[in-house]
From Swiss-Prot:
Belongs to the parvin family. It is found in: Cytoplasm, Cytoskeleton; Cytoplasm, Myofibril, Sarcomere, M line; Perikaryon; Cell projection, Axon. This is Paralyzed arrest at two-fold protein 6. Pfam families: CH (PF00307). Involved in the regulation of cell adhesion and cytoskeleton organization. Component of an integrin containing attachment complex, which is required for muscle development and maintenance. During embryonic development, required to recruit cpna-1, unc-89 and myofilaments to newly forming integrin attachments composed of integrins pat-2/pat-3, pat-4 and unc-112. Also required to reposition the integrin-based attachments so that they form the highly ordered array of dense body and M-line attachments that are characteristic of mature muscle cells. InterPro entries: CH_dom (IPR001715), CH_dom_sf (IPR036872), Parvin (IPR028433). One of its GO terms (molecular function) is actin binding. Residues 10-20 have a biased composition (Basic and acidic residues). SMART domains: CH. It comes from Caenorhabditis elegans.
Length: 375
């Protein structure tokens, strides 16, 4: 665990969209294949064994994710008799979407635990003993997890971790013993087990991050039997389609509209679109997509100013947004302007708007509509 500076919000790879400035102004390298011998065999007299493959996967896979996962540890490479270990395939270790998931999880953990001076740098190295997971659950659930005093013995660590994992499973509504992220796997620093548990926790607590959709991890499972390493491959689902970011709470009209009223929802969107354009047209701007055009905060800042009867100077916010951080700053500025008008605190969160959560965006616009619909 490190106590260095906090991580910045990770940015997502997004296609560059045209800004509104013009309108406002005036209108890992792969190894070479071994040569074949005269019998068609590669690499000399012996074929690569399963154990060689496991060793190579451990070295190359971890190297590919070395910005957020621990360096290779010699004790993880060599299997004891009967031992089972899981390794990411080289292709999975180089998957940019998986790297995004790791970065987003680290960002979320550091944001949540900043007040406890905890900074996560490597998911496996920092979380395998369960202490950080315990701190996270205690904060978010406002509970105290009764665990034995800190033990230096491996068995003591496992017992403590077992209690923490069982608590997480109870909160998530999972079986008491969930084999996908068992205490044994997490204590082994199994990447897939740790990340699957963290993703479910992030979704359960509506973390203000949006994961890439449908990320999978291809995993090699290695087991040593009678002195020989046998392997097989499995695929583990890391993320699916993330439908909502907003925190859990009392259901409102928008929850009902999204669940049961697609026709009425379309009508509400049409009304909000007309409301926004009625005011944005005053400065030759127009919105066509409520779902996406407010997430960078530009239209939101300008709209709040127009509703209050003033034009927000362009140097007060980022007009041509280049990064996720600039989106967040713009939306934060818009929230500050709304607060200054005496508007009630929005249920939507800044990060939810910047991440493009549709329900949160519509809730916020409806809040403005309710106050300013007669202007």
């Amino acid at each position: 665990m490190s106590t260095l500076g906090r991580s910045k919000t990770p940015s997502r790879d997004e296609p560059k969209k045209p800004g509104v400035f013009e309108k406002l102004s005036g209108t890992l390298s792969r190894k070479k294949k071994a040569p074949e011998d005269e019998h068609g065999n590669q690499g000399g007299a012996h074929h690569a064994t399963d154990e060689d493959e496991v060793l190579e996967l451990e070295l190359e896979g971890r190297e590919a994710l070395d910005q957020s996962l621990v360096p290779v540890l010699a004790r993880n490479i060599w299997l004891e008799e009967g031992e089972i270990r899981r390794y990411l395939t080289k292709e999975t270790a180089r998957d940019q979407k998986l790297a995004q998931v790791v970065d987003l999880l680290i960002y979320w953990l550091n944001e949540e635990l900043a007040d406890q001076r905890i900074v996560v740098r490597h998911l496996q190295e920092d979380l395998f003993d369960g202490q950080i997971i315990q701190k996270l659950l205690e904060k978010l659930e406002q509970i105290r997890i009764e665990v034995p005093e800190v033990s230096q013995s491996e068995e003591g660590q496992r017992q403590k971790l077992q209690i923490v994992v069982q608590t997480a499973n109870r909160i998530l509504g999972q079986p008491r013993e969930q084999e996908k992220w068992s205490a044994d796997l997490i204590h082994q620093k199994d990447f897939t087990a740790i990340i699957q548990l963290l993703v479910l926790l992030a979704l359960h607590y509506r973390a203000p991050v949006r994961f890439p959709d449908n990320v999978v991890a291809n995993v090699v499972v290695a087991q040593k039997e009678h002195g020989q390493v046998k392997t097989h491959r499995i695929t583990e689902q890391i993320t699916t389609v993330q439908t909502e970011l907003a925190p859990k709470g009392t259901r409102d009209a928008f929850d009902t509209l999204f669940d049961y009223g697609p026709d009425k929802l379309a009508h509400v969107k049409t009304s909000l679109l007309a409301f926004c354009n009625k005011h944005l047209n005053k400065i030759n701007l127009e919105v066509s997509d409520l779902d996406n055009q407010f997430q960078d905060g530009v239209f939101l800042v300008l709209l709040v100013g127009l509703l209050e009867g003033y034009f927000v100077p362009l140097y007060h916010f980022n007009l041509q947004v280049q990064s996720h951080e600039e989106k967040v700053k713009n939306v934060q500025f818009a929230f500050k302007l709304m607060e200054d008008t005496g508007l009630e605190k929005p249920r939507s969160r800044v990060q939810d708007i910047a991440n493009g959560d549709v329900k949160s965006t519509l809730r916020l616009l409806h809040l403005l509509f309710t106050k300013y619909k007669h202007i």
